[in-house]
Amino acid sequence: MRILVVEDDQALGAQIAGALVKSGYIVESALDGEQGHYLGDTSGFDAVVLDLGLPGMNGIEVLRKWRDNGRTMPVLILTAHDLWSEKVTGFDAGGDDYLAKPFHMAELLARVRALIRRSAGRADPVLVSGAIKLDTRNGSVTLHGVPVVLTAFEQRLLQFLMHRAGQVLGRTEIIEHIYAQDLDRDSNTVEVFVRRLRVKLGSDSIETIRGQGYRMARG
């Protein structure tokens, strides 16, 4: 899962990004509205954390431009002012949730998880595919009720496949969602991680669609 953080306070932005990375997300950051708008408009993200008080282009303008351009990723708005009028403006511009500063990082993480679940049409934080269960709140995985230990990349790949269960996901799309920009994006590594997951979760846990990509079963 890829998250964009647009926050001009470098210290706070680093804290948010660090907490998201520890939770298993791939994070990209922007310090001003123009950079944030560009990243959100040209790259695929599963959710955005967007501050309103940005230099260059304020958060409301950034959000409106995204929505005008057909960008539908869920957006969590951050602001230093807990004003009802500002909330209304943010929601009218296309925001999905709202969090006033200061806030507890655990609440921000919970709201991001909820946004991603809602955007995927799910209310349950536990993803299920056959005998496999993945709890998105803590990243734990079980097979027939028995805990399975996964590496960070294995967990990211599994969560992405399970979030999009029933859909065929190509290598390029998978790479964009589970690898940070500064890492080697060799598509052959996707095959390596798929093989590892099959060893741990069963040979039929992930289906290969010849010439297209991979798919996990729903429910």
Where does each model-flagged region fall?
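N-terminal/domain-start alpha-helical segments
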Residues: 1-119
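Short strand-coil-strand connectors
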Residues: 8, 128-130, 137, 144-146
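Structural detector for helix-capping/boundary residues
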Residues: 43, 52, 106, 130-132, ...
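Short acidic-rich active-site patches of cyclic nucleotide enzymes
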Residues: 96, 212-213
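The C-terminal output helix
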Residues: 114-127, 166
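A short, compositionally biased
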Residues: 121-122, 134-140
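Positively charged, aromatic-enriched patches within helix-turn-helix-type DNA-binding elements
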Residues: 140-205, 210-212, 218
